[in-house]
């Protein structure tokens, strides 16, 4: 691509799995930024994250280096999170929100508001019960 003068607009980390879960995520971001700067300096670097590992200092520092730090926060209700997002391992929504604040605005919050049912239970997080506390948090 580079030899043909074709360059990407954005280099995005996302997909099947959580990019920040990789044990060498910080080094991968550093290498990506170095290669981006060399071959396509106009391109942005983006990371789509479910926010699970932002409590790790190395992950936070790496995310602060990217152009688009996109972190997921569907709700502030832990019961809803466990029912719909079904995190495995450590996931404390209050801790996630506090760590999000440490980015001092250098983040994009991705949220999925939805209506419907799953396994016979409501997964509607569009009511004031869910939206107002979410607004307060963000």
Segments the model singles out, each with a brief description of its role:
Residues 1-12, 27:
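Conserved alpha-helical substructure of the radical SAM core
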Residues 13-15, 111:
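Short glycine-centered, acidic/aromatic-flanked micro-motifs in structured strand/loop junctions
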Residues 21-138:
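Conserved AdoMet/S-adenosylmethionine-binding subsite of the radical SAM
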